Amino acid sequence: MTKQITVHPILFGIYPVLFLFSRNVWQTKADVIWVPLTIVLFIVGLLWWCATFIIKDSGKAALIVSVFLILFFVYSNVHDILLVQHGLLFGRHRYLLLIIGFLWSITAYWIARRLVNVTTANLFLNIVGATLILATIPNLGDWIINKKAISKDQIKAIRPGNYEQVTLNLPEDPPYIYYIILDGYMRSDLLEEVLQYNNSEFVSYLENKGFYVASTSRSNYPYTFLSIPSALNMEYINYLGDTVGSESHDVLATYPLIQANRVGQLLKSVGYRYVQISSGWSGADRSLIADDVFTWKNKGPEQAFLSLLVEMTAVYPLVQPILDDWQD
């Protein structure tokens, strides 16, 4: 008789990581999954070993661990459905955690003491786990096939030809230049019109400090990953469609236009020192041309991805204050 191979605890452990990555595959890099995968696999292995040590049956231990993982990772969805969507009191964390814990406890007891056909149950969960992993392949496959990275050398090649003709004439004592982009912040007249909010004090403060405020400006694009590279390169960037494809969903394809932007290169060419201050958004965390890049501590894409993963789980209500402080 062939011994059954049980892998579903591993599959249920890595599925949430692959699922989250597949849903954000066009907005982040593959590097972000390795730390979460390592942590998850370590925890799954530890739980499986402990359960086997306690009940002396690795097959039943696998079932108990998988039930725990399922309840652990569906917690946020259950919470949203019960409390956020339907306003049910027992959807609150203080009650839902107890309910989830109780469900797992009685299920684990039944598996350990009552379940007879362990082989069939393990086979079924193997199939379910494999199906979930396979469900992430279409998104990941599309990303692997259609992703087209743009190198620094390609940036110059695909830009309009007038780039080399731009020159700057500086005064004898050139000023410091601070280019502050308040992404997603309405201009003053629209704030007043739409939200009835008067921000004239803020604008006046900037103007009194010598800043020029573009009072009637408008973004070239409705999304950050398009508007920021467009602003920093002083042009529309529709030509990117010829390189990555007009139907591409790859947000990362525009990042090199930020990291080697035209404004920074022009200013450096006449002697300016270029300092980039990151907002915490991954598109502005790195630069190919800046002399200095200041980034926020713990604000990289790896931390953001891990934070999103934790928010899916039953541990989030317990660590939310710590996680919020870690993200700040």
Predicted regions and their residues:
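Alpha-helical transmembrane signal-anchor/signal-peptide segments
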Residues: 144-164, 174
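Transmembrane and membrane-interface helices of multi-pass
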Residues: 1-148
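Active-site-proximal alpha/beta segments of enzymes that process anionic O-linked groups
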Residues: 55-76, 80-117, 173-176, 184-328
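A generic hydrophobic-helix recognition signal that picks specific residues
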Residues: 1, 176-177
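A generic local structural motif
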Residues: 163-166, 260
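Active-site His/Glu-centered metal-binding helix of metallohydrolases
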Residues: 10, 181, 185
